[in-house]
């Protein structure tokens, strides 16, 4: 299990002594008194690492404010001190960046780690499951509530079932372990009623599951209005209370913002924290479009439809341009990735759609730049991305350029190489929907009041609250009328 033999204490051949040693190392990394719940988790983790079958899956379901982040950071440090390699993964680039920030170690997206591009890929599948060459490593996956066991991209990635592929990849190594970390109060994967990666019953198909849960808010966070209200909403969900969420506002890190104050407050947060650390979270793409339009026009002073410096969000996975860019740090552009528009080269009208050639910079990938075609039609669309009908129309129009190719297979391959057909679908990223915000963390979060108008809004409200960084005592989590 140990990567560094010199780190193995000679007297710790006994698993029970090894368990004690690991627990001691974890406690040493935590600079405050642990809660009873944290102590139980530390004991369970230590036992899992020292005594359990490596094929067992460990689940840590941690409520907001319970010290889950601190615990994982301590675990990562303890593993390194014990000579055990931690491998940190998250579903999205933004979530990986958050994980890396609090753990102090590099983190990758799951897709970047477990899949590799096929050198002779056919037109239907481009990425196969990579080979896990690790020995005795511990894979820690944060934001596991986002993990689906199906894909809208079919079998472009491995089997098309991300959770299956993740488990298979980890077990493909020698004596590697898998720890899934998340919060089941957050939104499940799109189209799912629950989060399979945090559900012991769903995970039992893979074998032994060790399920643990943190539910005691740590003393340091007791005065956080963000966490108080997140806990309040969680209690509503757990007890089946179907009512409109009502936030308590008498805390220093949360306030109500009247409609007439919104633009001024937003500008203040842009000045204080930066645009990439400030977000508006709302329910629908229609509402997000309205906010993005107003923010660009009245706060940022934008005059054009799209301008250099705009923040954009990728709204549909895209594989075309990363494959054709040398040394690109991203396997693909993921739905939810945020980029700054550095340069606009030209606008084009083709196939009944509008495009632009752009250079995008991705902060979550060390400001890596990528030149690509972007599709402008999705910016103001009220659908999450191109509708099925629009996608079919684009395909049919592009196909007309290749009708001289008689073979349908060859023609389809040529269409898939067309940069306009593969244009990156984007929206503005100043205001986003709850699903798009999941896994991210910002220093200033504005919550649209529409998230508290219906009795079924509790889970959406919880997700919006989780987007605010409770460790930042200056965080503003606002709602506006």
What are these regions (language model features)?
Residues 38, 92, 284, 439:
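Short, conserved phosphate/pyrophosphate- and ester-handling motifs at nucleotide-, phospho-/glycolipid
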Residues 104, 295-299, 462-466:
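Short, solvent-exposed amphipathic alpha-helical segments in soluble enzyme
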